[in-house]
């Protein structure tokens, strides 16, 4: 049986009640050569049972993995990647959604450019009909530009499709809230070419209480862990770029924590 072009990995934890819109837009994708891998992270509600029911009635090619223990989104994504059969990996958070032509446009850009990674802009949706388009950084074409891009590149796995082989011998770190920040520069480093679609194709739902917006005194520590992971994963020739990125991460983590404390 022919392997799909894309494997879409979706970590889930007590999230079934937020998933209807994302599943709807998966079923409406104009490019259909893909599989969906749900990774249930030991949900304590009926999410796993609902996923099994959905698998039986859905038109999508679906596989479901259940973690042995609660491991967080990074490890859940790693399990999904290990099970993936697609040439490229895409990620979707359980409460977010794609534009209907997300995969079609990503595939077209891959074919056109031969890139290892394609990424796009995204919408930040606030759940009340309001949304904001977030633009991304330009891509690199030369080595010196690649260095700058590692320092400045986007932080989201979900707005990207990534050649599956780039994940060989590297795993997403088990860092709550900052695993994307740690992982994207490494994937860019390992890539031969990155391409960019200047169009918002992903919807990120801003939901108070979700993992990425929850109040936590561990935020700054998460970014410190992300920086340490980066510093140990990329050669010294990129030391300046990683230090620059690390300073950004640490400052963001500190300011984020201060703002959250002020809101309590």
Which functions belong to the PLM regions below?
Residues 89:
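Short aromatic/hydrophobic "clamp" motif used to bind/position activated sugar donors
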Residues 99, 104-174:
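Flexible acidic/His/Gly-enriched loops in nucleotide-sugar-dependent glycosyltransferase catalytic domains
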Residues 1, 205-264:
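C-terminal subregions of glycosyltransferases and related glycan-biosynthesis enzymes
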Residues 144-218, 222-223:
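Conserved nucleotide-sugar donor-binding catalytic segment
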Residues 25, 40-49, 69:
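A conserved acidic beta->alpha catalytic loop
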Residues 67-84:
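Glycine-rich, basic loop-to-helix element that forms the pyrophosphate-binding segment
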Residues 14-28:
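Short, well-formed alpha-helical segments that are part of the catalytic scaffolds
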Residues 34-42, 63-67, 94:
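Short beta-strand/loop segment that forms part of the nucleotide-sugar
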């Amino acid at each position: 049986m022919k392997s799909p072009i894309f494997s879409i990995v979706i970590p889930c934890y007590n999230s079934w009640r937020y998933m209807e819109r994302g599943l709807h837009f998966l079923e409406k994708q104009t490019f259909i050569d893909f599989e969906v891998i749900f990774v249930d992270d030991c949900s304590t509600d009926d999410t796993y049972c609902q996923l099994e029911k959905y698998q039986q009635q859905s038109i999508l090619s679906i596989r479901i993995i259940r973690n042995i223990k609660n491991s967080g989104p990074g490890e859940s994504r790693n399990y999904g990647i290990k099970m993936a059969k697609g040439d490229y990996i895409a990620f979707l958070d359980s409460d977010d959604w794609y534009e209907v032509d997300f995969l079609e446009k990503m595939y077209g850009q891959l074919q056109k450019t031969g890139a290892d990674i394609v990424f796009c802009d995204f919408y930040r949706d606030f759940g009340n009909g309001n949304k904001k388009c977030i633009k991304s950084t330009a891509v690199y074409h030369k080595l010196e530009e690649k260095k700058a891009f590692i320092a400045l590149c986007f932080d989201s796995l979900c707005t990207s499709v990534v050649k599956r082989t780039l994940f060989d011998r590297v795993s997403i770190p088990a860092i709550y809230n900052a695993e994307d920040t740690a992982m994207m520069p490494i994937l860019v480093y390992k890539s031969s070419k990155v391409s960019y679609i200047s169009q918002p194709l992903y919807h990120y739902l801003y939901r108070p209480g979700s993992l990425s917006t929850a109040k936590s005194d561990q935020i700054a520590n998460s970014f410190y862990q992300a920086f340490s992971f980066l510093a140990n994963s990329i050669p010294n020739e990129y030391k300046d770029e990683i230090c620059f990125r690390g300073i950004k991460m640490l400052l963001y983590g500190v300011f984020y924590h201060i703002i959250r404390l002020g809101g309590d």
